[in-house]
């Protein structure tokens, strides 16, 4: 049964149906768009390295980087590469692995039905051989080495490694050359069978499409496939300390000038649904009010020459981990880290209702503009859905957040023992 969900304020109607095999399908028709985006996502990412495989009773520990490895391998079939099928059908295809999910997507202005069929079928039909797995190790090994030479990537993961002692978020998404050497065809099938069941997946389509036609096409496609019900996936719950693992780290690299990131580790990252949405948006308003371009703090850091246009801040919230990262290129990494840390610790007195109001207007404006991008909607929708939130509730919740809500977030989140600094400095 197709269920329309109305979002009157945004004038959007979302169509949803849960297939008999458990697959959630969502369609967002956009009349004025010429491009259609479809994203097929599994709730399986780099942090899912300890779990009970389908049909077994014991927890296993799989090699780091296997989710990303599997993403690469799914595109390869006995008779060639799926990327070529998409391009013959006038579509551009892509995929990515994050900490918590793996997504496969295409965008096209024509042949939407054929491309959608190709997307669903290739993801639901794995083909792994020992030979192709061995070959892929070399390719992904090169990718890993490339990231190892990227100072911004090393800085970002450096700050995460500083924060987390036990949680697998501290492991690079692609793993290491050593860890992927242990990946086998059988391990890939074991991960695939466990995490790529339709009941652990979501298909989202946005564009100038007819929701009834799309959903019945998916229904027909899924009806032909012999899926059986699957028990809930058991993942290991990691015990992680509240305080950061390391207060500071310096990485020497071939860079022109230093880079610095201050990390703030979330205290209680086990929120979902409306509670998480309110928390995340309150945190975003706080960071915008504290460090946005129109803030006194930004001006002071800029005038001292500590920051330039690379300065950025963001807050990542998932189930089981969460953190803010603030910084950029700087000639004075120590002073910048000290200033950012002290601004965070003084946030309670630096924030006013007026500053929150300005931040709110900016955030709502940016969000409404982003809703004109099918790519943005497609990539964000699933993340929200997997955390029991809705992308289309963002404006409503932003409008409701008060100064008191932001002060509560400051009380909960900001403490000296949850702050850490990572620096990348030139080899001298």
Curated annotation (Swiss-Prot):
Its cofactor is Zn(2+). Keywords: Hydrolase, Metal-binding, Metalloprotease, Protease, Zinc. The keyword Hydrolase applies. Its EC number is 3.4.24.-. Zn(2+) binds at residues 68, 72, 143. Binds 1 zinc ion per subunit. The keyword Protease applies. GO terms for molecular function: metal ion binding; metallopeptidase activity. One of its GO terms (biological process) is proteolysis. PANTHER family: METALLOPROTEASE, ZINC-DEPENDENT PROTEASE. Belongs to the peptidase M16 family. This is Uncharacterized zinc protease YmfH. It comes from Bacillus subtilis (strain 168). The gene is ymfH.
